[in-house]
From Swiss-Prot:
Gene that this sequence comes from: ZNF438
Molecular function in Gene Ontology: DNA-binding transcription factor activity; DNA-binding transcription factor activity, RNA polymerase II-specific; sequence-specific DNA binding; zinc ion binding
Name this polypeptide is given: Zinc finger protein 438
Swiss-Prot/TrEMBL GO biological process terms: negative regulation of DNA-templated transcription; regulation of transcription by RNA polymerase II
Bias (Polar residues) ranges: 16-29, 150-159
Length: 828
């Protein structure tokens, strides 16, 4: 009886297929532009669903729909039959027969193995994608853009309207429990339609899980009398000749019809364009009007990634088989997808029942798909951020370049402080645009082009890498304009993947690895390694490594804004504006030390301390360069008081109180030719004397190149006990008295007997000045001459001296010895 009854509905179903197709195509007219995308994935889906699951006890015509369903779901152990509803002619119901063993279990591992081989390694599991993790198993068979999908969708309600005659079937109570939720759900949201569809699909996967989700009210799985009415309502949406069979209330019929139409639109739209499934399900259903928050967009992107991954899984599961049967499969697979999307919304016992059914269908792949779902959800969120940040960075790249250049000009302080503020401002700007300018649709075309999990994983990892690089690009590294003293590594191109950093002309020192922005800074820095001082002061000849140091020196010591007393060197006529510089010049160049006396009142003019005894003359070199700086400091500290300068020879430690006397000493003792006419009106520091002595400065400078070495001299206490007579002989000119010999009349003898005999007889006249600041004294005729050469010429022509130079040496020697002898007697 079943065969005879089932044949007419089959014919009717085949005849009514075009009408159902027309109805579904009307719903697809709004989405017709996506119809060209689906055929790209058709071959993989068609080959993956050809499973020989025909029931042996049913005819091919009657089992066409159920067999296709069993192929789609992989339920080879379940057989179906069309039963006529009692008391209703022309109304049939699809009845599930007892489980029969088939070759399907053999195909299960074959379906799961290739999918497991292509699953990516899960890396990140966001907490809010717990629901999405249960959605992934449903997306195994999502996409097959076949042309007969609408017909298959309408053929299922046609074959299923008959009420069941076997209430003892296993999965009958579940659809019955879930039917009220279908009637109670609102009719305007596609999410509700998915929920209702999922209720039936989750609880009766062995029966007709694929078609039931698409047309939930049309699934005849309960024995209650309300099922025929619900089934008639479903048939009303697909077929016109079932309208008279409706027995339920009008509002529920209208609601169920709206739900069915929305589900059909979503199904066909996802069949034709898998990338729009997330938009059809999520954007239309859950997003309210007005501003769109971030979480809905992240979920939508997650759904899109799920769809793409499911396509790859279908490609992995593809098996050879005829394409004619696969043309009717795509719409049924979408029902299975819609059924599992609401798995998390079901009660606990229902979810457990659903998990049991799914484990019977494909147990090994469920866990892997869950992991992949979590991975894809996290990747979709990060990829969404990656799509937004580059646009903003490209928009602000010009401003950032100008900002960096300005900061490099401002200086070190602002370069270190302002970049952080700019980075915070930039982050705030990006965050603002991220919340108000989401563009999830722009992500869909790029993700839809992926064909395998490997490529998806690679792109996903690339997105993570770009996200990390973009985060790093906002750090202070991108402000790489360090200053001279910065020890950071040499800047490189921080921005990759299309973002190139601003190259800066950095120069590195190969010795200490320091970096400098300007080449001139590097040159000045290299002078510190070579001890080269190319910048010297033209006034005091002090040299520096950097030009800035020389500028500072000129401002401090030789600047015109400061009122200074310019000091001229007595030997080389150089001008100095600072007392320390002048003293340093005398020590280094002319070997003359300037010091002070302990106290002006303690010593009388006749008791002025002398520096050195003639007995220790041979030890000149051992005491030359010590304590010079200390004496300078004493002079500077006490220069406010009335002190007497002591000009000491740095070689023999002889002290004088005028530069003229020390010049004569250098000329006589050390043989330094200092040309200059020292007249009575001249004084230390006079310009005439300085100009005459300029030419003698260079040889002395070359003979003594060492600089800055301190010289040691006797302290003031030692000076008080050393040679007071020599000091008196050299400094009697300060009192304005020139001691000359009273015994006139030159004698033919030498000056030595005259000195020796005059000394004991006249102790007050035993001392005389052979030379003074006023000139040279002739001991023979008491004539004053201005220069030594004049004195020697005078001796030669006036006094007929054969060797004036020898006479000068003898007089100089006797004079020194006589002074020493007289001083010893005076002390007694």
């Amino acid at each position: 009886m079943q065969n005879s009854v089932s044949v007419p509905p089959k014919d009717e179903g085949e005849s009514n297929i075009p009408s159902g197709t027309i109805q579904s195509r009307k719903g697809l007219q709004n989405k017709s532009q996506f119809r060209t995308i689906a055929p790209k994935i058709v071959p993989k889906v068609l080959t993956s669903r050809m499973l020989p699951c025909h029931s042996p006890s049913r005819s091919d015509q009657v089992n066409l729909g159920p067999s296709i369903n069993s192929k789609l779901l992989g339920m080879s152990t379940q057989n179906y039959a069309l039963m006529q509803v009692a008391g209703q002619e022309g109304t049939f119901s699809l009845v599930a027969l007892p489980h029969v063993a088939s070759a399907q279990p053999i195909q299960k591992p074959r379906m799961s193995l290739p999918e497991n081989l292509k699953l990516p390694i899960p890396r990140y599991q966001p907490p809010r994608n717990s629901k999405a993790s249960r959605k992934k198993p449903i997306l195994i068979f999502p996409k097959s853009g076949c042309s007969k999908a609408p017909a298959q969708t309408q053929m299922c309600p046609q074959m299923s309207p008959s009420p069941p005659h076997h209430p003892e079937l296993l999965y009958k109570p579940s659809p019955f429990e879930e039917v009220p939720s279908l009637e109670q759900a609102p009719a305007s949201i596609s999410t509700a339609a998915l929920t209702n569809g999922s209720d039936h699909g989750d609880l009766r996967p062995p029966v007709t899980n694929t078609h039931g989700s698409l047309n939930p009210p049309a699934t005849p799985a309960s024995s209650t009398p309300e099922e025929p009415a619900k089934q008639d309502l479903t048939a009303l949406s697909g077929k016109a000749h079932f309208v008279s069979k409706i027995t339920s209330s009008k509002p529920s019929a209208v609601a169920s019809e709206k739900f069915k139409e929305q589900v059909d639109l979503a199904k066909t739209m996802t069949n034709l364009s898998p990338t729009i499934l997330g938009n059809a399900v999520q954007l239309i259903s859950s997003v309210p009007k007005g501003k769109l928050p971030i979480p809905p967009y992240s979920r939508m992107k997650t759904m899109e990634v799920y769809k793409i991954k499911s396509d790859a899984n279908i490609a992995g599961f593809s098996l050879p088989g005829p394409k004619a049967d696969c043309d009717k499969i795509p719409s049924t697979t979408e029902g299975f997808n819609a059924a599992t999307k609401v798995a998390s919304r079901l009660p606990v016992p229902q979810v457990s029942q659903q998990s049991a059914c799914e484990s019977a269908f494909c147990p090994p792949t469920k866990l892997d798909l869950n992991h992949k779902t979590k991975l894809n959800s996290g990747a979709a969120k990060r990829k969404g951020r990656k799509r937004k940040v580059p646009d903003e960075i490209l928009a602000f790249q010009g401003k950032r370049r100008k900002y960096i250049i300005n900061k490099c000009r401002d200086g070190k302080e602002r370069v270190k402080n302002d970049p952080q503020e700019f980075r915070d401002q930039k982050l705030g700007t990006l965050k603002k645009y991220r919340s108000i300018m989401p563009k999830p649709i722009m992500v869909i075309p790029t993700l839809a082009s992926l064909a395998s999990p490997t490529t998806l994983q690679s792109q996903m990892l690339g997105g993570l890498g770009q996200d990390v690089l973009l985060n790093n690009s906002l750090t202070p590294k991108y402000l790489g304009c360090k200053q001279d003293n910065s020890s950071s590594p040499k800047p490189s191109s921080v921005f990759r993947n299309g973002f190139s950093g601003i190259k800066k002309p950095w120069h590195r020192c190969h010795v200490c690895n320091h970096h400098f922005q300007f080449k001139q800074h590097l040159r000045d820095h290299m002078n510190t390694h070579t001890n080269r001082r190319p910048y010297s002061c033209r006034i005091c000849r002090k040299s520096y490594v950097r030009p800035g140091s020389l500028s500072t020196h000129m401002k401090l010591h030789h600047g015109e804004n400061r009122l200074k007393k310019l000091m001229c060197c007595e030997f080389c006529a150089k001008v100095f504006g600072h007392i320390r510089v002048y003293f340093g010049h005398l020590k280094e160049v002319h070997r003359v030390v300037i010091s002070t006396e302990p106290a002006p009142s303690e010593l009388q003019p006749g008791d002025i301390p002398k520096n050195r005894d003639m007995s220790v003359r041979g030890m000149e070199g051992s005491l030359e360069r010590e304590n010079k700086s200390n004496l300078e400091e004493d002079f500077l500290l006490n220069q406010a008081d009335e002190v007497k300068l002591q000009i000491k020879c740095g070689r023999c430690q002889i002290t004088a109180q005028s530069f003229a006397e020390i010049k004569f000493h250098l000329l006589d003792v050390h043989g330094e030719e200092i040309e200059g006419r020292l007249q009575e009106g001249t004084f230390p520091g006079s310009k005439g004397t300085q100009e005459e002595l300029v030419q003698h400065a260079s040889p002395d400078w070359k003979r003594h190149p060492e600089r800055g070495k301190p010289e040691k001299v006797h302290s003031s206490s030692e000076e008080s006990h050393a040679c007071p007579r020599l000091k008196r002989q050299l400094h009697l000119h300060q009192n304005g008295v020139e001691m000359l010999m009273e015994n006139e009349g030159p004698q033919s003898g030498t000056n030595k007997p005259r000195e020796t005999c005059q000394g004991p007889e006249c102790p007050g006249l035993h001392t005389f000045l052979l030379w003074s600041h006023s000139g040279f004294n002739c001991l023979l005729c008491a004539e004053m001459l201005g220069r030594k050469e004049d004195l020697l010429h005078h001796w030669k022509h006036q006094h007929n001296c054969e060797d004036p130079s020898k006479l000068w040496a003898i007089l100089n020697t006797v004079s020194n010895q006589g002074v020493i002898e007289l001083s010893s007697e005076a002390e007694k």
